[in-house]
Every structure is written in structure tokens, then in C-alpha cells.
Amino acid sequence: MPFRSNNPITRDELLSRFFPQFHPVTTFNSGLSGGSFLIEHQGQRFVVRQPHDPDAPQSAFLRQYRALSQLPACIAPKPHLYLRDWMVVDYLPGEVKTYLPDTNELAGLLYYLHQQPRFGWRITLLPLLELYWQQSDPARRTVGWLRMLKRLRKAREPRPLRLSPLHMDVHAGNLVHSVSGLKLIDWEYAGDGDIALELAAVWVENTEQHRQLVNDYATRAKIYPAQLWRQVRRWFPWLLMLKAGWFEYRWRQTGDQQFIRLADDTWRQLLIKQ
């Protein structure tokens, strides 16, 4: 249930007001991102989440709640409470592995997701690319970065092959291997977009695995594999710019050196693929 309040509350206030019988537990799912913790009562567990990006508008967090409210429980956690800066969702029991599942199994999960009703809001990458440029460290802004940004702005985003609800952050850490099948967590980037954008954004280990995932998906979706792969490739420069910009943005936000290393690695990939 959504609970409207303009006044932020503390963790203790949240628990005492809405979950008085629950208590925090110390075991965490490795797939959870920062700002999340588990609560438990008589074997029932919930995940209490906060926005990953403290500077993001509250509307982005609310959209995540709305997306989870629309999705079937067989692929995503069911939400129970939303209020400012807090969301409570089901804990998904299972294993979070360090590698992706079989490509055919993952293709089946993504194809099922893409058959669901659309969320109602579009994913557009250009505003994000421009935001990350504006919010990055001025010392890190280069002529090459600006040149690539202008090139994408002029080219415009690829026309969607098929418009569907997307997760947009599919990697091993966001996949729960449960007894009932694969499920996805961390839906903060969800929205409607091109199925090829989703496939392009999957954090794969190598090109061979990526091609196999696209081929397996194409079989289910009854699309020519070569056609789908061409569309996936059209999204590559957009996604690499998105990743690089996000790492730069997070570096300025947190000062964490890992983001500089990830940004530098992504810029190198962009130069190679040009």
C-alpha cells in the first residue's frame, strides 16, 4: 500500500509504526544494494529498501513501487508499503550467484517480462546522458566525451523494434535462483522501452554469451536472430555512454575510487568500439 507523507521518518519509526512485531536480521542477500535490510517475524521476511541515489527525485522511487505492483510475483518481489524514502517488499528466498544462468533460461525470463502490460512511462537515455555530463566532476569532462554526447544527440535513439516493460539492470547479482524459477530484484531503472535495449544492457561475460542470449530470445520471440542482433548493436554506444556517465556521476557523488576505475574501463571500451 502507498502511504503518503511529506515528512521523512527514521528506520525505528518505520518499524514501530508499520511492522511492530518484526525485527531486523543480520543476514543479507548478496544481490541487495546499499540501503536495504531484512526484517523478520515468525519466519516471514521482508526487505526494507531506500533509494540508491539520494539525489534522485522521489518520483523515481515511486515508479519502482508502481512497477512492482504491476508485475506478477513469479518474477519480482511483491511490494507491501511505500512512503517517502522507504519501500517494503517481499524477501525472495533463493541463491544469488556470481554468474548468469543458462542463456535459454534467462531469455525465457526476459521474454516473459516483455509480454507483461507496459508500465506507462518510457525509458529515454538522452536526458540521462546529459544529466550525468552536467553532474560529473568538471575536471573529468573531456572534449571526447562532449563529442560523443553531441553525436548521439544528433543521431537520436534507435527506433524500437518492440516496445515492452524492461528491467534495465539485468546482471548476476540481481537474479535470484528460487525453487520456482528465476526472479529479478532491484527494479529502480524499470520502464517501457525497446526489447533490444534490454538485451543490449545485460551484463554478459563475453560476445559469444551475448550472441547466444540474443539467439535464444529471438527463437522465443519469433524474430530473425540477425535482425535482433543488429538492433542490439545499435544500442551499444548509448549503453556504454550511459554506463560511463553513471560511473562519473557516482564518483562525484561518493568519492569512491571504484567508480573512477569503472568509468575509465568503459571509456576504453567506447574507443575500441568506435
UniProtKB/Swiss-Prot annotation:
Pathway assignment: Cofactor biosynthesis; thiamine diphosphate biosynthesis; thiamine phosphate from thiamine: step 1/1
Protein biosynthesis as UniProt keyword: no
Enzyme Commission designation: 2.7.1.89
Record-linked InterPro entries: Aminoglycoside_PTrfase, Kinase-like_dom_sf, Thiamine_kinase
Catalysis: reaction(s): thiamine + ATP = thiamine phosphate + ADP + H(+)
Record key words, sorted: ATP-binding, Kinase, Nucleotide-binding, Transferase
Superkingdom, natural source: Bacteria
A biological process term (GO) from this entry: thiamine metabolic process
GO molecular-function terms, A-Z: ATP binding; thiamine kinase activity
Function statement: Catalyzes the ATP-dependent phosphorylation of thiamine to thiamine phosphate. Is involved in thiamine salvage.
NCBIfam families tied to this protein: PRK10271.1, ycfN_thiK
Protein family according to the UniProt entry: Belongs to the thiamine kinase family.
Protein name stated in the entry: Thiamine kinase
Source organism: Shigella dysenteriae serotype 1 (strain Sd197)
Gene from which the chain derives: thiK
